[in-house]
Regions:
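A short, small-residue-rich loop immediately preceding and capping a beta-strand
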Residues: 80-103, 107-116
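Solvent-exposed alpha-helices and their adjacent loops that cap or buttress functional pockets
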Residues: 2-3, 25-26, 80-83, 104, ...
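Short glycine/serine/threonine-rich phosphate/pyrophosphate-binding segments
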Residues: 16, 40-44, 70, 95-102, ...
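ATP/NTP phosphate-donor binding region
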Residues: 1-85
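Active-site segments that bind and position negatively charged phosphate/pyrophosphate groups
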Residues: 188-299
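A glycine/threonine-rich phosphate-anchoring loop and its flanking beta-alpha core
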Residues: 105-198
Length: 312
C-alpha cells in the first residue's frame, strides 16, 4: 500500500490571510512559531495580523538557533509550548524548517511552513537534513510533509539576494538528478509521476532566473520572483516527495553527492548549499558525457554568477 500526500500552498503578498482557515481545517487552536531571527522579524507581523481577532492562541515565538543540529532540534522538542501546540509554524530557510520538521516527528505535530527565503525546497518536503555541531553532514530525517506552505513573494524579495541566488543553483539540480537516477527505467506510478514533474523544474529557472535575481537585488516583488519561488519550493518539493519513498530513492544523485563530499573535507571559505550544488550539476553532466546540457547549464551559471570551476 502507498499513500501520497502533498502540501497545500498559498502564494501571494496577502498569503497569511489564509492562515486562520488553514488552521481551522486542522482543528488547531494553539500554535508555536519557530524560526530564524531575521525570518521571524519578516514574517511575524503578517502572521500576527492574520491571527488577530481569531480564537487561535500563539503559545510561543522561538528563535531556533542557526543550524539544524540535534541540539537545536532537542530545544524545540523540549519546549512546553511546542509540546502543547496543535501546529508548529516554521519560518525561515532550510535549516530552520528542517529543525522544526525533525522535531515534529517526536512531537507528532502538524507543521506549517513559511519560507522567508527560497534557497531550497525544504518548505514542501518530507525529508530534512541534520548537521553535526561542526557543520558536517550527520544524515537525514524523514518527517511528514508540511501540511501548508505560505509563500510571500514580498518577504522573499526583501531577503538577502544571495539566498535566492543559491536557491536557483539548488533547483537546477532537480531535473537532471532525477532524470539520471531514473535512467534505468521500469518505474512504478509514483516514481514516474515524480519524473514527469521533474521535467517542469529547469525551464522556469532559465526563463525567470536572471530577472528574478535582479529584482531581488532591488527588493522588488515581481512576477519573476514569484515564479522562481514557486519553482524552487513547490515544483522541486513535490518532486522530492514523489521520488523519495520507503522502497526507492531517486530524489538526488551526483550533484548532491558532490555537495555532501565537500562537507566532509577541509575547505577554505564559506559556500551556500545551492552554490556548491550548481557546480555539482556540471559534474553530473561531465560524468554522463552530456555535452549539450553541460554547455547550456554552464552558460546559465555564468549568467547568474554561479560557479563553473572549483576555483570559484
Amino acid at each position: 500500500m502507498r499513500t501520497i500526500g502533498m502540501s497545500d500552498y498559498t502564494v501571494g503578498e496577502d498569503c497569511f490571510t489564509e492562515l486562520p482557515t488553514a488552521l481551522a481545517e486542522c482543528g488547531a487552536k494553539k500554535v508555536a512559531i519557530i524560526g530564524g531571527k531575521r525570518a521571524l522579524a519578516a514574517a511575524l507581523p503578517g502572521i500576527e495580523a492574520a491571527l488577530e481577532g481569531t480564537d487561535v492562541e500563539v503559545l510561543e515565538t522561538r528563535v531556533y538557533g542557526t543550524n539544524s543540529t540535534r541540539a537545536n532540534i532537542a530545544k524545540v522538542v523540549n519546549s512546553p509550548a511546542c509540546q502543547e501546540a496543535d501546529v508548529l509554524i516554521a519560518c525561515g530557510g532550510g535549516k530552520a524548517l528542517d529543525t522544526v520538521k525533525t522535531a515534529a516527528i517526536e512531537l507528532k505535530k502538524i507543521v506549517f511552513t513559511v519560507p522567508t527565503i527560497c534557497s531550497n525546497c525544504s518548505a514542501a518536503t518530507a525529508i530534512a537534513v541534520v548537521y553535526n555541531d561542526d557543520g558536517s553532514l550527520e544524515g537525514y530525517s524523514y518527517p511528514n510533509r508540511p501540511a501548508h506552505i505560505f509563500i510571500n513573494p514580498k518577504i522573499i524579495a526583501e531577503a538577502p539576494a544571495e539566498y535566492f541566488w543559491a536557491g536557483v543553483g539548488d533547483a537546477l539540480s532537480k531535473q537532471p538528478e532525477v532524470e539520471y537516477a531514473t535512467s534505468a527505467g521500469n518505474l512504478e506510478h509514483t516514481a514516474g509521476l515524480g519524473l514527469a514533474l521533474a521535467h517542469t523544474c529547469s525551464e522556469p529557472l532559465f526563463t525567470y532566473g536572471v530577472q528574478g535575481l535582479e529584482d531581488v537585488r532591488q527588493n522588488l516583488s515581481s512576477e519573476a520572483v514569484k515564479q522562481i519561488a514557486l519553482d524552487i519550493v513547490v515544483n522541486t518539493g513535490y518532486v522530492s516527495n514523489l521520488t523519495n519513498q520507503n522502497d526507492y530513492y531517486y530524489n538526488s544523485s551526483v550533484a548532491h553527492a558532490f555537495y555532501n563530499a565537500t562537507c566532509s573535507i577541509p575547505r577554505e571559505g564559506t559556500y551556500l548549499h545551492g552554490e556548491v550544488v550548481s557546480l555539482g550539476v556540471l559534474v553530473l553532466f561531465a560524468y554522463t558525457g552530456d555535452t549539450e546540457n553541460f554547455e547550456r547549464y554552464a552558460a546559465f551559471n555564468k549568467q547568474m554568477g554561479l560557479p563553473v570551476t572549483l576555483e570559484q
